[in-house]
């Protein structure tokens, strides 16, 4: 795991410790697995069409589909109201961490029209990596106050 991936995982793990934060990440996971929309980094939604979005945009779209969120022009307010001010700061930290990861590890420069450089996201690898980090963060974190697993009894000799 790279340093950038660790930063993203740490932010998501912090969010997953709260029930609503965990639910938001579960919405994100279902959204990126089921929606058929593209997955971006660093922004809520692509400015050129709105058919792709960041992890939390996917959570919003999935939440609207499941009746968790009301349709709104900007999902930021709905998500902030849902998870609260403190956890929303973690969401913003995660978006920044995703931006760093996406730009450093999954973006390649190529020559575009007229020989001008153009950024290109390796979308398939990006999607696979984000999904893996998200699953790892959910699996490795329990909400605060969740019951500890029962200890395994030691056999008596």
Segments (PLM) and residue ranges:
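Short, glycine-biased loop/turn motifs at secondary-structure junctions and
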Residues: 1-157
């Amino acid at each position: 795991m790279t340093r950038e991936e660790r930063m993203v995982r740490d932010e998501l793990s912090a969010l997953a410790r709260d029930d609503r934060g965990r639910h938001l990440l579960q919405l994100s996971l279902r959204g990126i697995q089921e929606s058929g929309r593209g997955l971006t980094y660093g922004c809520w939604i692509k400015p050129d069409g709105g058919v792709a979005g960041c992890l939390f945009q996917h959570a919003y779209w999935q939440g609207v589909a499941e009746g968790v969120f009301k349709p709104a022009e900007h999902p930021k307010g709905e998500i902030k109201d849902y998870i609260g001010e403190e956890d929303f700061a973690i969401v913003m930290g995660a978006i920044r961490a995703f931006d760093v990861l996406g730009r450093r590890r999954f973006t390649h420069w190529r020559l575009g029209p007229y020989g001008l450089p153009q950024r290109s996201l390796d979308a398939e690898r990006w999607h696979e990596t984000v999904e893996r980090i998200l699953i790892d963060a959910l699996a490795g974190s329990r909400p605060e106050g969740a019951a500890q697993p029962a200890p395994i009894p030691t056999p008596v000799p």
